[in-house]
Amino acid sequence: MDKTARPRGPTLVPRRQAGVALILLALAAPSVLAAQQQWLNSPIGDGDRPVFPFFEGWYDNGDGTYTISFGYLNRNTRQVIEIPHGDRNHIEPAEFNGAQPTYFLASRNRGVFAVTIPTDRRDEDIWWYLTDEEGNEYKVPGRARSPAYELDWYPRPHGSLPPLVWFQSESEAGKGPEGVWADATLTTRVGQAIELSVSTRDESVRDPADPRFREMIPVRVVWSKYQGPAGELTYGRPGSPSQETTTGDSGPGAEVISLPDARGTARVLATFHAPGEYVMRAQADNWSGPDSTSGDQCCWSNAYVRVRVSQ
């Protein structure tokens, strides 16, 4: 799978309103809607609840390819769940397997990864399977067909757009669920802190006459483990005048940084306690804006970096 993302142009079809989307979705794919709605209504708890895979929607990239966005729902409010790749966590067709997370933060997390398919495979379903410790299997198909699921890159009512994210050069920036992958694999040792950094810029254009926008809408960056051996990481800060610590609402397992100027580099120190191959994810969003929310599938971007940890 090619994990190198690039900024996409706008889709050709306007975004549907939520109510209309639900009606169309019920007509177009009742089984998918019923399953995901049932999962949303399932009991929540502090621990020992399942994780459900979610199909968020699809993008027409305008170049003959389609990007399918996936997220998940961890019904635990305070417990991170880890499900390694394998029989309990896999994607079919197998060529797309490995893109999905193994580390599941609490609650609803939308658009954590995406896969891109060509036009001649548009009729295929991309299935994501998760199985809990009791052997219960949960699966969802990603498909780039139903108009009710089509997503877009148009500015929201007050101008919000997904922030750009990059590791080396802004010319290589990505955005949205597909985001961007770092070319280089970082290396460190168990117990030795390593700096993780990602740059971002919010390109939203908002009305300066609106009092809500007299000050910049900050970009929030959430660093978390995405894949890797079981176990938690320890986070610290290298110290940077361009970023602020925020408490956020991401729950355990994540480190949250605010960039008050809506651009800059978000840095954290990560210490790994087990050797192995890891992927770290940085989510950049502007959700403090009045028209930006994950529930509207806007406006955030993903950035991923591989880390190899030796003993």
Language model features by range: what are they?
Residues W39, D48-F55, Y59-N61, Y72-N74, ...:
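Extracellular/lumenal mature domains of secreted and surface-exposed proteins
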Residues R122-D132:
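Acidic, low-complexity intrinsically disordered segments
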Residues M1-P14:
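N-terminal secretory signal peptides that target proteins for export/translocation
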